[in-house]
């Protein structure tokens, strides 16, 4: 990574970032059993809505392909004349769900103010451009240190909660925490340190960091590296699954994939405070995988699709199917949630954690 100075700012640039899987998960919408909400308020589709004829192309990663196919089949059972397909690249997509959108690319996106009621969203994560909502947050996304308690129990070692504890832990020094990519390093360590050093959240979202807090954050990151508790590794997942590391720095989406290969006796815990000293606020940065609609998309077809996607029943089904925390406010009390999901929310609701919501507007460079 390197920095460039521009107008009193230090522009933080990563090595060419490997784009995270563009999160695009559309669940089965249960339209046959529940009906759909028509614009006439009757709870059923009007004949004019059913008669809409159009095509919608969605750009997504293969990780979400099967979920989108299920959603398309369910949606088409009610709207047979709206064909949903897949785009080969972002430039030809009508609908895109991504974790990043630069202001330059935002010029080509449609305003979504009238698509759904935005009161149920975390307002800080609504993606605004020129005063209009162009992006609707779907899933919460965060990066941080994940620990498996099992290796600590085997070594009779204490599980660290703060940087001071990690530095003084013989187990962490012998089996350091590993980081595999620059994106997780930026969001999980550098950005929280930048906030602790007096930097602004808006700077983090744009990637344009003020020099003084950035320099302090870089010095603290350097000390973490010198202490040996955090190391870069080409295959951090392999070491974490085998129990040969004290923890792994990765995104929530990545830990869900990793969990599938973990031993049954493993107990995963989320620890965003590893980069924070004692008596210092733990900054947990939350972003969102956000839905965008291209300006060239057929607006009525897109409105119908987006409206069904963000309905309460659909969001609850999304949570159940994907284990991803929702950026839409819904009541999950009567629904069974996976342990890793509860672990994330217990940290999110902790009074010891300062939650900072950020929209990622960085350029790809």
Predicted regions and their residues:
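Glycine-centered hinge/linker elements that transmit conformational signals in sensory
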Residues: 204-234, 259
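Short, solvent-exposed loop/beta-turn-alpha elements that line the ligand-binding surface or hinge
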Residues: 113-119, 197-216, 275-283
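Periplasmic solute-binding protein
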Residues: 122-160, 179-204, 285-293, 364-365
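Hinge/lid segment of periplasmic solute-binding proteins
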Residues: 99-144, 155, 269-274
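Long, aromatic- and glycine/proline-rich binding clefts that accommodate carbohydrate-like moieties
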Residues: 319-365
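Extracytoplasmic/periplasmic substrate-recognition and gating elements
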Residues: 261-326
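A ligand-binding cleft/hinge motif common to bilobed small-molecule-binding domains
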Residues: 101-107, 249-266
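Conserved N-terminal structural module of periplasmic/extracytoplasmic solute-binding proteins
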Residues: 2-4, 8, 12-14, 19-25, ...
